[in-house]
Amino acid sequence: MQRLVEVESVSFEEDNNEISLRPSNWDDYIGQEKIKKNLRVFIDASKKRKEALDHILFYGPPGLGKTTLSYLISNEMNTNIKVTAGPMIEKSGDLAAILTNLEEGDILFIDEIHRLSPAVEEILYPAMEDYRLDIIIGSGPAAQTVKIDLPRFTLIGATTRAGMLSNPLRERFGMHFRMQFYTEIELAKIIQKASLKLGKNCEDDASLEISKRSRGTPRVALRLLRRVRDFSEVENEKSIHLQRCKYALDELGVNESGFDEMDINLLELLISNRGKPMGLSTIAAALSEDEGTIEDAIEPYLLANGYIERTARGRVASVKTYEMFRLSYPTSLKLEDDLTQGKLF
């Protein structure tokens, strides 16, 4: 069963809903202010020169608006955007077919770009750098390289694992942007705008309540909004109010910190280890969960908000987590922290 606070997997129906709620201009796009400010400068400069925008890499946890920003860039540049994903490009021929169908100034958006195979990456290098496609025809001594000129295009890559990108690929992006978690105020504004598009007003305090439980992630906020709206409509309420909102979210198993059962299980597991670090593989086995899911979908929010810490030996629960569970922080850990920070000498 899909987690309500899951940020990686998106159903077809939900993806269509997200598209309908997607902002169409910079003023409608809330959050990521520094990125927006820089992008507007680069886009304006590119339009004045009548050149294709330089290649862009967006990285950071899932659900923070990488795809939405790419569509916005397409709108601002008044160009077409073609969307694909790393796992869908299995062979170099697949990428060659996509590239040769691009037109001057088009944007190619590749999600999960870190999952491209090395063979596909090799095709991408000259395409990004020289707008040229090198295709090998035949094999052995009779093999020939055919060079095909490509229109000047912009590649936008998105990844949740920037560290898995090869250096040659990473270096070919002219702009690198790290997506940040959203503040509660930013999410509340997103929720209010989205609720009106859904035909259901969400009151200010209810919007803030949803934002508090959305893990700093718009995708989660919009998903929770739709579910809270369901509860409200069943009761024939004209708007979403705070009491209904709290009731719905509690029923859905999302607590005031935005944690669900999976988060609680992870934190309880770390606490049960009596302060000793746990490796990722051990955690995954204990929770019967995939390592990638833990690393990409569960950990980022817990790390960013100080609930868990990564050490050279593994993951440990932080003081904040012990306080949340109303437990005493292990003395051995406190002593180790003091030694590390030089507080005892």
Curated annotation (Swiss-Prot):
Main location per the UniProt record: cytoplasm
Cellular localisation: Cytoplasm
Residue ranges, annotated region (Head domain (RuvB-H)): 256-345
Pfam families to which the protein is assigned, alphabetical: AAA_lid_4, RuvB_C, RuvB_N
Keyword hit for Metal-binding: no
GO CC terms in record: cytoplasm; Holliday junction resolvase complex
Keyword RNA-binding appears in the UniProt entry: no
Region (Large ATPase domain (RuvB-L)): 1-182
Organism domain of life: Bacteria
Entry binding sites for ATP: 21-22, 63, 66-68, 129-131, 172, 182, 219
BP-aspect Gene Ontology terms: DNA recombination; DNA repair
GO terms, molecular function: ATP binding; ATP hydrolysis activity; four-way junction DNA binding; four-way junction helicase activity
Catalytic activity: ATP + H2O = ADP + phosphate + H(+)
SUPFAM superfamilies xref list: P-loop containing nucleoside triphosphate hydrolases (SSF52540), Winged helix' DNA-binding domain (SSF46785)
Region (Small ATPAse domain (RuvB-S)): 183-253
Residues where Mg(2+) binds: 67
EC number(s) recorded for this UniProt protein: 3.6.4.-
Catalytic EC class: hydrolase
Subunit description: Homohexamer. Forms an RuvA(8)-RuvB(12)-Holliday junction (HJ) complex. HJ DNA is sandwiched between 2 RuvA tetramers; dsDNA enters through RuvA and exits via RuvB. An RuvB hexamer assembles on each DNA strand where it exits the tetramer. Each RuvB hexamer is contacted by two RuvA subunits (via domain III) on 2 adjacent RuvB subunits; this complex drives branch migration. In the full resolvosome a probable DNA-RuvA(4)-RuvB(12)-RuvC(2) complex forms which resolves the HJ.
Record remark on domains: Has 3 domains, the large (RuvB-L) and small ATPase (RuvB-S) domains and the C-terminal head (RuvB-H) domain. The head domain binds DNA, while the ATPase domains jointly bind ATP, ADP or are empty depending on the state of the subunit in the translocation cycle. During a single DNA translocation step the structure of each domain remains the same, but their relative positions change.
NCBIfam families for the chain: PRK00080.1, ruvB
Function as written in the Swiss-Prot or TrEMBL entry: The RuvA-RuvB-RuvC complex processes Holliday junction (HJ) DNA during genetic recombination and DNA repair, while the RuvA-RuvB complex plays an important role in the rescue of blocked DNA replication forks via replication fork reversal (RFR). RuvA specifically binds to HJ cruciform DNA, conferring on it an open structure. The RuvB hexamer acts as an ATP-dependent pump, pulling dsDNA into and through the RuvAB complex. RuvB forms 2 homohexamers on either side of HJ DNA bound by 1 or 2 RuvA tetramers; 4 subunits per hexamer contact DNA at a time.
Name of the protein: Holliday junction branch migration complex subunit RuvB
Organism from which the protein derives: Aliarcobacter butzleri (strain RM4018) (Arcobacter butzleri)
